[in-house]
């Protein structure tokens, strides 16, 4: 006969089992709560990693400017002052000085290979210290600029440039002062480091509506370069990457529509103003995309030519000073 188990022992065993089951359930619950906490912490860690890690990746993986990559913007500001000199045919008029500035801002759009479309504005002004019905107080232009240009890795060379805008004297902006000067230039390699440069400069407002551009560009070596191209020849010496010394010639001016005057010869007439200069100077490049060019030279001749109506006067030569600032962004 099987011996009976005492009732108290059975109840104690039952309580023990219940206690074990309760402990097991609590352990499960704690383990579940712990898993939830771990999951929450892992989620927060992942979120923070995404938030801050991606920002770091964005900063680290931002596209860097490649060597030779063209800038988005090209800005150029030049200003010069020509000391006073007398106009030869108007000795009683007195000595006339000239202050000149030009600002150009262009946005560069890549087309293909090394060719770019440049679009922007060009504003230029000449202010004269003396004026009358023959010689205006100022000559100005406000024009848009559209260029198809070649990027060498350091500079843009316009192949085709159009500058539609208003070319006027004083403050007389009128519909008949609208003009579209056009410049087309191409280079052809004829020998190693020697290029033939040919082109035309067309402007209906000038006495010669089409002016040829011709010459050669010879990169003698890494330090010397000869750009024998009319009308802006230049010989330069570059001892290092930050400095360039040069001698050069420059032709500035253009065709403009004169405003109303009391002289029938100049009243609303076309004026071809030109100034040919020779100079030497230095170009300083403290960093890529920034340059300062300082020039001291001689204004050989300044000319006021109302080629359709009569007066054609020139001023005597005089010294001038120029500062040119170029910034690429």
PLM region descriptions:
Residues 107-109, 148-150, 188, 202, ...:
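Residue-level signature of outer-membrane beta-barrel architecture
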Residues 111-117, 154-158, 193-198, 223-226, ...:
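Repeated loop/turn-to-beta-strand initiation elements of outer-membrane beta-barrel proteins
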Residues 54-175, 179, 269-277, 310:
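Transmembrane beta-barrel domains of bacterial outer-membrane proteins
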